[in-house]
Amino acid sequence: MFSASLLLAFSWASTGAPDVTLTAAFRETKPEALSSQHATLARDCESSKLAATCYHAALGSYLLALTNLQADKDAAANQLAQCGRFSALAGTQDTLKAEADALLSACYGLSIALNASKGMALGPASTTLLADAERLAPTSPRVHYFAAMRLFRTPKIWGGDPVKALAHAERALKLFEDSEANASGLAWGKPEVAHLIEQIKAEK
């Protein structure tokens, strides 16, 4: 048997894409592998301040927050705070700004889910971040994914719309086939979009 850390190292080296191995660890319910890779990325972001590394660290924080959302809300809140800090560092690079803004918008959404009292402040901020991301990168599949997620998870009274959510998700799926739409160098998201489409259709 190979250790989780060895398998993670092999996967990372094989794909060259930390975002892919992070999301794979999340989908496959491997919290130790996810935590291990995130810890490395977080340290590297803090020391190097490189935008791409900080984006991956922010993504890891977001995924860990999702993992802890029900079982350990304090841990989830801490990860969401980290997501905000790392996303801000990632947003300093033009090609990643839209991706970082969309991710930060999602982290704000989770923060509101954890503590509804934050909605007054973070709700408008989340909306603005996502609108900016859509304006800056209208062909980013991940931006459309987060737009779909927001519309699907938000109650209708607050602007949620499953029909528009499905349109964004289906647009995202098509954009994953377009190499120009992935100019940011990121590769994650296609399985997540496909799963979201299934969820939206199941609840229609």
Positions of the model-derived regions?
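Sec-dependent N-terminal signal peptides
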Residues: 2-11
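Amphipathic alpha-helical repeat scaffolds of TPR domains
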Residues: 15-24, 47-68, 95-114, 139-155, ...
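Helix-turn-helix repeat elements of alpha-solenoid scaffolds
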Residues: 26-42, 73-86, 119-127, 165-173
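Alpha-helical junction/boundary sensor with strong preference for TPR arrays
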Residues: 45-48, 87, 94, 130, ...
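Surface-exposed, polar helix/loop patches in the mature regions of secreted/periplasmic/lumenal proteins
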Residues: 84-136
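Outer-membrane beta-barrel transmembrane domain signature
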Residues: 123, 127-131, 141-142, 149, ...
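Terminal, low-structured helical/coil segments at or just beyond the last alpha-helical repeat
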Residues: 163-166, 171-204
